């Protein structure tokens, strides 16, 4: 069995499992309780927040624990926009965002009268100049991803952040696919809100965090004073500890992992050099996602045949799995009538993958396409 769908989710690291198990076995208190068991849990929660803040180059009060990327995106977008709608109701985002951003913004448009400008990519790129040209006097939020979940394309976050410093506009970045893979320090990049999800960097599912430079946003969940009164509900302490442990491990080996994944991608492409294929990517890319198409090969059938051979890849975002639809990202890149929409598959790597696995994938593709 070969797992090559790491942009959907990653296997948990042994360190994260060990740290979580220890918490589940030894720490039973509610972090909000004032007795000794609660204080013990509260201490672990504070330490996890401090450690995570240190990894991001910020302060603990800027870290809010959530259930994952989707909740973090919703909290930042809805919480900030509803708090500041008296200043304006214009939002800027891009056509290649994750559905948890696009549909959240659409919710504000449909139910609260907001207006959204959706930036379209040009030559598979989103530029800071496009964002700048879209700014209006009533713009209150810009929301972009750091790295695209389907293609691995990188957006010019630092450049956008620099431009927005001169405007009374908050900048939200969905960093779910980038964090742990490249250095990210939100304060240096001019980011006001940053979303992340643990299961994308070998942590547990169902936990994530939101970095917020300010507490000037409305609570998304109500009924308790947890997370500095911004996220009601008892914190998932074991998962939070596991998440921080996983991120520490990924960041410690970040350079080595980047080099390894770049080499694995190169090896794979060399192995399939004899096949007719094309890549769906931009000039600025993360190496761990390979969005590739083979002319004349339907992606759903190719996916099935690889699955029968014990190889797991995908056709795009797992959040729309089971729904028969083409990629909105590739549609934005190439148009709704492009053959790439029905031919392209996503191969996404992690440091746990090996050169032998990529060679086996290449040989299996040659066997299938050569039939």
Task: Annotate each predicted stretch with a short phrase.
Residues 1-371:
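Pyridoxal 5′-phosphate
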């Amino acid at each position: 069995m070969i797992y090559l769908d790491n942009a959907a989710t990653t296997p948990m690291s042994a360190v994260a499992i060990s740290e979580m198990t220890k918490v589940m076995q030894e720490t039973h208190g509610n972090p909000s309780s004032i007795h000794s068991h609660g204080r013990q849990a509260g201490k672990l929660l504070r330490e996890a927040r401090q450690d995570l803040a240190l990894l991001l180059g910020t302060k603990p009060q800027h870290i809010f624990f959530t259930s994952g990327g989707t909740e973090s995106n919703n909290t930042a977008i809805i919480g900030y926009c509803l708090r500041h709608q008296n200043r304006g109701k214009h939002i800027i985002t891009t056509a290649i965002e994750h559905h948890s951003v696009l549909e959240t913004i659409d919710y504000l448009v449909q139910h609260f009268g907001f207006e959204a400008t959706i930036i379209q990519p040009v030559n598979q790129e989103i530029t800071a100049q496009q964002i700048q040209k879209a700014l209006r006097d009533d713009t209150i939020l810009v929301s972009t991803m750091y790295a695209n979940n389907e293609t691995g394309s990188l957006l010019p976050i630092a450049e956008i952040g620099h431009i927005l410093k001169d405007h009374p506009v908050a900048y939200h970045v969905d960093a779910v696919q980038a964090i742990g893979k490249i250095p990210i320090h939100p304060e240096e990049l001019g980011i006001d809100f940053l979303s992340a999800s643990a299961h994308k960097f070998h942590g547990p599912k169902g936990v994530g965090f939101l970095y917020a430079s300010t507490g000037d946003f409305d609570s998304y969940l109500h009924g308790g004073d947890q997370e500095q009164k911004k996220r009601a509900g008892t914190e998932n302490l074991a998962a939070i500890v596991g998440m921080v442990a996983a991120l520490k491990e990924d960041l410690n080996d970040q350079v080595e992992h980047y080099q390894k994944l770049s080499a694995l991608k190169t090896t794979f492409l060399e192995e399939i050099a004899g096949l007719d294929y094309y890549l769906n990517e931009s000039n600025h890319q993360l190496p761990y996602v390979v969005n590739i198409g083979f002319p004349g090969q339907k992606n759903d059938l190719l996916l099935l045949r690889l699955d029968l051979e014990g190889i797991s890849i995908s056709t795009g975002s797992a959040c729309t799995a089971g729904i028969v639809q083409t990629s909105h990202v590739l549609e934005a890149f190439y148009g709704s009538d492009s053959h790439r929409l029905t031919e392209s598959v996503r191969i996404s790597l992690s440091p746990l993958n090996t050169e032998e696995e990529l060679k086996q994938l290449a040989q299996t593709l040659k066997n299938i396409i050569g039939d």
